[in-house]
Amino acid sequence: MSSTFYLEILTPERKFFWGDVESIIVKTPTGEMGILKGHIPTVAVIDIGSIKIKKDGKWFEAVLSEGFMEVKQNHVIILVDTAEWPDEIDENRARAAKARAEERLQRRRSEAEYIQSKAALARAMARLKVKGKYN
């Protein structure tokens, strides 16, 4: 009996991942959420951070931006703005984005700028964290 479920990760630009997996761990606004075969149907908000995917007994990690996840009948669909494998992350670009976001947070002019800067900082830090694990 198979202990896998089907996972799809989609962005506006591409089908990032698809296939049978044993487990995933995603970041939500309330903490990490693990999914195994047979998980109850649910819809969840995905927060900026990493996704850990267990496939064929091995763990893989990628960075996801914000989005949504639907779990139903051993099929998980994740819709996010961006998704990147560690080898797709430009570390210098992520460091520059982090510095820009930190500077904007220091001189924020509006609530909207603050929210945008916090999101940009979270994306840059997630990229650097995952990239740092796989250098």
Swiss-Prot record:
Keywords: ATP synthesis, Cell membrane, CF(1), Hydrogen ion transport, Ion transport, Membrane, Transport. InterPro entries: ATP_F1_dsu/esu_C_sf (IPR036794), ATP_synth_F1_dsu/esu (IPR001469), ATP_synth_F1_dsu/esu_N (IPR020546), ATP_synth_F1_esu_C (IPR020547), ATPsynth_dsu/esu_N (IPR036771). Its main location: membrane. It holds the Pfam family ATP-synt_DE. CDD domains: F1-ATPase_delta (cd12152). It is a peripheral membrane protein. It is found in: Cell membrane. The keyword rRNA processing does not apply. GO terms for cellular component: plasma membrane; proton-transporting ATP synthase complex. GO terms for molecular function: ATP binding; proton-transporting ATP synthase activity, rotational mechanism. HAMAP family: ATP_synth_epsil_bac. Belongs to the ATPase epsilon chain family. F-type ATPases have 2 components, CF(1) - the catalytic core - and CF(0) - the membrane proton channel. CF(1) has five subunits: alpha(3), beta(3), gamma(1), delta(1), epsilon(1). CF(0) has three main subunits: a, b and c. Produces ATP from ADP in the presence of a proton gradient across the membrane. This is ATP synthase epsilon chain. It comes from Acetivibrio thermocellus (strain ATCC 27405 / DSM 1237 / JCM 9322 / NBRC 103400 / NCIMB 10682 / NRRL B-4536 / VPI 7372). The gene is atpC.
